[in-house]
Design a protein with these regions (language model features):
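Outer membrane beta-barrel
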Residues: 2-52, 58-90
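Membrane-embedded beta-strand positions of outer-membrane beta-barrel proteins
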Residues: 17-19, 80-82, 128, 137-141, ...
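Outer-membrane beta-barrel translocator domains and adjoining extracellular loop/strand segments
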Residues: 30-36, 92-100, 149-157
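Conserved small/polar residues in nucleotide/adenosyl-binding loops
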Residues: 188-194
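Outer-envelope beta-barrel architecture signal
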Residues: 13-15, 76-80, 124, 133-137, ...
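Extracellular loop and loop/strand-boundary signature of outer-membrane beta-barrel proteins
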Residues: 54-57, 110-114, 157-161
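Outer-membrane beta-barrel pore domains and translocons
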Residues: 22-24, 83-87, 142-144, 178, ...
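Residues that define the transmembrane beta-barrel architecture of outer-membrane proteins
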Residues: 2, 63-67, 120-124, 131, ...
Length: 197
């Protein structure tokens, strides 16, 4: 496993630029997020997730990152972000169909090596965020494709609504409004499988 990146930050109107391997998170993380977040918390104030934008990837994790180019420019209170990623992923492919991605990064056995870098994944999209001290609103859109390969999970009760197909589009809107006594955080998410089966 190898990883490399060039990351520039806070240069005039350029808030960030990532070339190579990077991570990202926008909104409340339903559309896209590589950040670690606990699944539950007893503290209500911690339920809101922070938007970290793009960050460099320097972990030994072979799966949880993007490879390509991404950047954010800032115009007054407006952040405009775009990203593109293309990389090979591990999966057990049978006649251009796979049931799931292999995400453990282990290649100890022959069957592990047979799944290594067998499919391609292309991801592109963007985020627009307008922020003031007591208010922000953001729109995130993301499209990903497995090219000629199709995901077809084994039919089980727990994956009844999992994505099936080779192309998918996700979009989400998030906002935060804060007053002296009340803080309101909300998120709306939409998924449009473009060729699900």
């Amino acid at each position: 496993f190898y990883s490399a990146h060039l990351f520039l930050k806070d240069i005039n109107w350029l808030k960030s630029l990532a070339i190579g391997d990077y991570k990202m998170s926008f909104g409340q993380g339903l559309v896209i997020s590589n950040d670690f977040s606990p699944s539950r918390t007893a503290v209500v104030a911690q339920a809101e997730r922070r938007t970290n934008g793009f960050r460099r990837h320097f972990s030994t994790n072979e799966q949880d990152f993007f490879r390509g180019v991404a950047g954010t420019i800032t115009i007054k209170n407006l952040d405009i972000s775009v990203f593109y990623s293309y990389r090979k992923m591990d999966a057990a492919v049978d006649s251009l169909t796979f049931t799931s991605l292999k995400t453990d990064g282990l290649h100890r056995l022959q069957r592990d090596w047979e799944k290594r870098k067998t499919i391609t994944m292309q991801v592109y999209g963007g985020n627009i965020r307008y922020a003031k001290p007591h208010f922000h609103v953001g729109l995130t859109a993301l499209s990903y494709s497995f090219g000629k390969f199709k995901m077809d999970p084994d039919p089980k009760p727990y994956n009844l609504f999992y994505f099936k197909g080779s192309n998918n589009f996700n979009m989400g809107v998030d906002y935060m409004l804060k007053t002296n006594r009340i803080k309101s955080v909300s998120y709306t998410h939409l998924t449009l499988p473009t060729n699900s089966r």
